[in-house]
Regions:
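DNA major-groove recognition helix of helix-turn-helix/homeodomain DNA-binding modules
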Residues: 60-79
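Short, amphipathic alpha-helical "recognition" segments used to contact nucleic acids or chromatin
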Residues: 8-25
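Recognition helix of helix-turn-helix/homeodomain-like DNA-binding domains
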Residues: 40-58
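Short alpha-helical "recognition helix" segments of helix-turn-helix
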Residues: 28-36
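Alpha-helix C-capping/helix-to-loop hinge sites
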Residues: 23, 30, 51-55
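Terminal non-globular linear segments
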Residues: 17, 21, 76, 80-85
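Short, charged recognition helix plus adjacent turn
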Residues: 6, 10, 52, 60, ...
Length: 86
């Protein structure tokens, strides 16, 4: 079940960490935050935990969620390419 929060005409998805539970501990989130978002790892960890910048409830905007999806797809393709070279 996806948790959606509406705030100031923005829709935020707040349960992304749960949706990524099977890979959460395997990913270097610092690199994802820096390379794909241009943000700090703490920013991304807060987003994954459904916390906004002020400590309240928040999450990913639809645009940020699309960026995260693209980052994970890119990473999966790079892993597949590396495996094919073996």
């Amino acid at each position: 079940m996806e948790i959606v929060i509406k705030r100031n005409d923005r829709v935020l998805v707040a349960d992304v960490k749960k949706q990524l539970s099977d890979i959460y501990m395997k990913i270097t989130w610092r690199e994802i935050a820096n390379q794909y978002f241009g943000k700090s790892s703490s920013w991304l960890y807060h987003k994954l935990d459904g916390i906004d910048g002020n400590g309240g409830r928040g999450g990913f905007t639809q645009e940020e969620l699309a960026t995260l999806k693209d980052a994970l797809v890119d990473l999966s393709e790079r892993i597949h390419t590396a495996a094919d070279r073996l």
